[in-house]
Amino acid sequence: MLVSATEMLKKAKAGHYAVGQFNINNLEWTKSILLTAQELNSPVILGVSEGAGKYMTGFGTVAAMVKAMDKELGITVPVALHLDHGTYEGCYKCIKAGFTSIMFDGSHYPFEENLAKSTELVNVAHNLGLSIECEVGSIGGEEDGVVGMGECADPDECKTIADLGVDMLAAGIGNIHGKYPANWQGLSFETLDAIQAKTGVMPLVLHGGTGIPADMIKKAISLGVSKINVNTECQLSFADATRKYIEAGKDLEGKGFDPRKLLAPGADAIKATVKEKMELFGSVGKAE
């Protein structure tokens, strides 16, 4: 069932585990993630970037597909449909389309402007029963054209945004979107600890979950991270499985060219990746 992310993240924070946000790009992605969450009895957040939303012909199409698929597959675990790294305008489009959760990424604005826009969107979202995530300190790498260098957020600025009543807070702690470079310095647990001390029970969000070592993930969860975003890793798994299918010539065997057969190995690879992450994050069996 589609719900806001508020309750699942409160439970994750209290239970010292994290809920995975897995970004969707099409029907196969969505189906694979939903089925895995149901199989493992885990809450899940479906992330949609503005670029992916545009690719799928608009947020209205995405919301309709997810709601219908959730119903037709008989999904009973909590599912939040969440805008990832939303612009100010994108947030309003997703609210209108029927998303249950939004993220406003105002990290590229001067702090006061980020604060003003975040305040407005928190009030709008909560009046509609939606959850909202805001960001302080840009996350490294590139996300739909927004480039961040992996900076660390100011804990005092994090507290100011948290005090607005956001449901989850994304704070830069040296994390990066996409593949991590060989010279990456790792997560700044000192920064995370300081942010946790300032924000208390606020669920914290770790973006760029792909490629972070398992021990760092577990330590981040112990320091208050309750939501971890995964996108690139599913894309790499999908691409690798699809490549092997083609290179083995299976598309030339019988009706192996049928998209339902051609895309099946990739879909299975996404399921395996999502399962691995849910087990690592500790969310298996936590759906209520």
Q: Where are the regions a protein language model picked out?
A:
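Alpha/beta enzyme core
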Residues: 3-11, 15, 27-52, 57-76, ...
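A short N-terminal beta->alpha junction/helix N-cap motif
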Residues: 17-25, 50-54, 261, 265
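Short catalytic-loop micro-motif centered on adjacent basic/acidic residues
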Residues: 19-23, 81-82, 103, 204-207, ...
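A general structural-boundary detector
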Residues: 20, 145-148, 182, 207, ...
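Metal-dependent phosphohydrolase cores
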Residues: 21, 199, 213, 259
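Active-site proximal loops enriched in glycine and acidic residues that flank catalytic Cys/His/Asp
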Residues: 173, 208-210, 232
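Glycine- and aromatic-enriched membrane alpha-helices
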Residues: 239, 243-244
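Extended, intrinsically disordered, low-complexity segments
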Residues: 246-288
